[in-house]
Amino acid sequence: MANLKTKTWNFHMKDYNDLVKKLSQLKPRVSIENLPSSILQVFKKEVNTDYNSVDLTCIDKKLVESLMPFQREGVCYGILKNGRCIIADEMGLGKTIQALGIVHYYRNDWPLLIVSPSSVRYQWSEAIYTFLPSVPTHYVHHYTTAKDTFGDAKIVIMSYDILKRAISSLERHVFGAVIFDESHFLKSPKSARSVAASVVASQARRVVLLSGTPALSRPKELYFQINLVMQKFLGFHEFGIRYCAGTFGKFGWEYGGSSNMQELQLLLNRCCLIRRIKSEVLTQLPSKIREVVILDPKLIKTETQKMKKIAEAVQRESFKNSEGNTALLQHYRETAEVKTKAICNYVNDLLESDTKFLIFAHHLTVLNEICKTISSKNVSYIRIDGSTKSEERKVRCDVFQEQDDCLVAVLSITAASTGITLTAAQRVVFAELYWNPGILCQAEDRVHRIGQQGSVLIQFLIAKNTADDHLWKLMQTKLNVLNKAGLGQNFAVEKSTEAKRGNETPSNQSNLLSFFTKASVQQDSAAHREKIEDVHQLLEEDDDALITLNLDGLDEDC
């Protein structure tokens, strides 16, 4: 079959021998390069690709019901590969829930080890509590130091840094199933973390790797990851010659290039790797996917005397009086200080992915530390805050939009939430929360605008036992009022790392305001006008008085 676009011919594998035989008659006018016998064997082998043949009823019902169609296919793919696979879906497509579905299917092989960057360890436990409610909470253990013990835990979660330091313990403790999150952390086979990962994977029956950036353009970096799930894959030299444009140089063989990439992608999909990009599944995705990221509590010092006193004051005072306002504002400022280290740790891990993102914060100290972190990695970024002149904003936005190496936009929540377009990114990170959900929605829409071709991932970085606990509830209270009117900001977020998947309607302030300004014989006009003013304030203002709004009456009418 001819493909006019690519100017290539496609033949069925069963016709391979006949094709080679007939082409051989054209020598020497035609040069023929046969497929290596090991590759031929892979393609000729019968492979079950019938996803409908997989019975998912043994997986927790909550998880199965939360799967989008393409995620269900991902779970089935992993099961058809006997729980040894690489899920390489693009960022924001829900690799976590797919991995949990696969390993829960094989829970008889547990204990399960989950290895991830330190900044997202607690996202995993939150996802387990949400999507696998049948798993008792005491089954889950965060392994936080090399001297820690596994005990009777059925699910152990640790960072890559701990993995390499705990190798002696891991050699003695067999995990039947392993998940390596952000597996591009294992691209170098000689690194200490990769050596430890190899030890763990060699003992496990089920191994699932997750990576939104699987280095398909740099196949050399992918080889070790493939070997973790397929230990009888091609030898490295054979792989390097075929797919890394291997050449013999001055200092020996070099495998820094890429070759036969279309063949490699077909081979990997047949063997162990499934990858979907947003454009392929866009019809199944909401326009915005929101998720909560629980920051590493080990990096957040909430036990100081100062934080305890402020937290007690917030608990004691009502938000309807000035004392309560002052206490919460002070708590908000202190939270910025104590969560900054954890925020920067998360930013460090995001930079590993080499993809563009926006990060919003409110306090200058947080913005400054984020910028220092990015600079320390020699990554190009822009910053827009209250001190940025209007003409300079456009210049900086153009840099972010047009220059591929400019990966991060560091933005002030209040100063950069309107009037700019940054659609080159598909991820928005809120390092801090804010009183007004309307402001956050406006900030999100710097990416989610006309010209954005994909679904946008929105992440909220939450520090437990800080002002975030109160601010999140405060935001939800305000949003519940709007949602009851059927005209909310669509800010629904699951209590986990995986966003609530569903159809979303873009927020529309004009519709909301017109709803409340319509005449109604059932409403007292004076009281109604007062509530209209409250709604204006709710959506538009961002001063300290926002937290004093009395929404009870409005709530009842809605």
Task: Give a label for each model feature.
Residues Q98, D109-T130, L216-E221, H362-T365:
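Conserved Walker A/P-loop ATP-binding site and its immediately adjacent core
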Residues N82-I102:
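Walker A/P-loop
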Residues V120-Y143, V229-F233, N378:
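Conserved helix-turn-beta segment of the N-terminal RecA-like "Helicase ATP-binding" lobe
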Residues W435-F516:
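A conserved SF2-helicase RecA2
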Residues N108-P111, A177, F185, S194-S279, ...:
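Conserved P-loop NTPase motor "coupling/switch" region that bridges the ATPase
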Residues M1-C85, E126, T130-H138, G151-V156, ...:
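Charged, low-complexity
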Residues S279-S380:
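Conserved helicase/translocase motor-coupling segment
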Residues K356-F360, N368-E369, S375-A416:
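Conserved helicase ATPase core of P-loop NTP-dependent helicases/translocases
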